[in-house]
């Protein structure tokens, strides 16, 4: 109801809730490559958890894994974005205190 009140055409809105960051980026890539959409919004990049982190043990070190995943994805997506003229918006969060999930 809120989105409709803001003018969003709900009937043409595609919504995805991927299981991993890689899956979300793959979905975004396929949508962009198809040329069927004008806008792709990823909210939030911070919630894109790499598959290795999901499948790994809680004590495993995953330093830089998300950054590498996003860097690789952006290299792949940028050519498709340029070719199809799709707008891609990636929303992220800034955190002042590491480990705090919500707020500062």
Swiss-Prot record:
Keywords: ATP-binding, Cytoplasm, DNA damage, DNA recombination, DNA repair, DNA-binding, Nucleotide-binding, SOS response. One of its GO terms (biological process) is DNA recombination. InterPro entries: DNA_recomb/repair_RecA, P-loop_NTPase, RecA-like_N, RecA_ATP-bd. GO terms for cellular component: cytosol. Can catalyze the hydrolysis of ATP in the presence of single-stranded DNA, the ATP-dependent uptake of single-stranded DNA by duplex DNA, and the ATP-dependent hybridization of homologous single-stranded DNAs. It interacts with LexA causing its activation and leading to its autocatalytic cleavage. PANTHER family: MITOCHONDRIAL DNA REPAIR PROTEIN RECA HOMOLOG-RELATED (PTHR45900:SF1), RECA (PTHR45900). Belongs to the RecA family. This is Protein RecA. It comes from Streptococcus salivarius.
């Amino acid at each position: 109801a809120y989105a409709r009140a803001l003018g969003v055409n709900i009937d043409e809105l595609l919504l995805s809730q991927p299981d991993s960051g890689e899956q979300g980026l793959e979905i975004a890539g396929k949508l962009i490559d198809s040329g069927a959409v004008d806008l792709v919004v990823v909210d939030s990049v911070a919630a894109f958890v790499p598959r290795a982190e999901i499948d790994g043990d809680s004590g495993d070190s995953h330093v830089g894994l998300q950054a590498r995943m996003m860097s690789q994805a952006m290299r792949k997506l940028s050519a498709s974005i340029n070719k199809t003229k799709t707008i891609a918006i990636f929303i992220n969060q800034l955190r002042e205190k590491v480990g705090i999930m919500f707020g500062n």
